[in-house]
Every structure is written in C-alpha cells, then in structure tokens.
Amino acid sequence: MASMGLQVMGIALAVLGWLAVMLCCALPMWRVTAFIGSNIVTSQTIWEGLWMNCVVQSTGQMQCKVYDSLLALPQDLQAARALVIISIIVAALGVLLSVVGGKCTNCLEDESAKAKTMIVAGVVFLLAGLMVIVPVSWTAHNIIQDFYNPLVASGQKREMGASLYVGWAASGLLLLGGGLLCCNCPPRTDKPYSAKYSAARSAAASNYV
C-alpha cells in the first residue's frame, strides 16, 4: 500500500511538472523590461518569450507579435525552444509509461514488468526535468550577466520573467516525481527456486542414507 501511494504521488508530481513545462513554453515572459532604481528604462514593458514578444504600453494596451523567423531569437532562447519542446514530448512518453506500469492498471500482468516499466518512466521524467532546468538556468544566467554589464545599453537590459520561475518549478516537480518512481523495486523471483533447490537436496540426502 505504501508503495502504491509513493507511486501515485510520483505520477501526480510528474504530471504537474509536465503541465508546468507546457505553461512555461507558452507564456511569453522569459524576459521582461528591467527597472533600474526609480527610473523606468522605457515607457513600454516588453515581454519576450519563445514564440512571440509582447509590448505593454503605459496605458495598459498590449500588442503581441509572433517571431518572423527562428533567427530572430537570441541563441539561448533558440536552444530553450528546442529543449523545452523535447522535454514536453519526453515527459508525455513518461506519462504513457507510468500509466502502463501503474499498479492500479491492467496493461501488464507481470508485477516485475510493471515495476521495471515504472522505473523507466521515472528515468524519462528525470531526463525531461534536466531538459527544462538547463535552458531556464542558461537564460537566467545571461539575463543577470547582461544586467550588470556596463557595456550593455540600459534599453537592452531585461529581468527574469515569470516563465523562468515556472520552468524551475516544473523541473523540480519532474525531478522529484521521477525520483519517487525510480524507487519502485521489482519483486524478487528467486525465492521459490531456492526453496525447491533446498527441498531437492534434502530429499536426495535422505535417499542416500
């Protein structure tokens, strides 16, 4: 029962992380306009995401535009787009494997095969979490580096957007859920064989006497 509860908790955390990755991918808030002291860098708030950028006027009006080309993105956001999409696909595979190997499903009859499938699902979730945390941390590092770089113009300085925090939370959920699923140990099947072997030895010894 405890093993099933651990498994359900791991699947739930991983699914929440998977949904958070999709939210991180969709939100155009990887980079936002920076505020330096009490002065606003520009009269507009600029949001930059993986798929579009949005400009929010001081009046509250917002306009979003999809990137015309992949080359319009900075290098870190190009890599982030690829890794986040791969992470979503890999996590979807992990969800499928966790359903197949779940204790409360009948997709597999063998308990050992179920446990092994669940371990594979946990490893897949761990990989998905790593694929998210790498681009999010890379983008955050570049933002901080440019913010304190005196050679970068004030209008080009950005701050970390909400998508980065969502990405960190998503990677944490995926890593935690995958770690819990990897704790599913397959049942041992060598006990019956050892019992039969010992019984056969005792029978042979009695016949010899």
From Swiss-Prot:
Q: What is the effect of changing residue 35 to A?
A: Decreases interaction with Clostridium perfringens CPE
Result when mutating residue 35 to D:
Abolishes interaction with Clostridium perfringens CPE
Q: Where are the transmembrane segments?
A: 8-28, 82-102, 118-138, 161-181
The effect of residue 40 to A is: No effect on interaction with Clostridium perfringens CPE
Ranges for region Interaction with EPHA2: 1-103
Q: Which residues lie on this side of the membrane: Extracellular?
A: 29-81, 139-160
Q: What is this protein called?
A: Claudin-4
The organism's lineage is:
Eukaryota, Metazoa, Chordata, Craniata, Vertebrata
**Gene assigned in the entry:** CLDN4
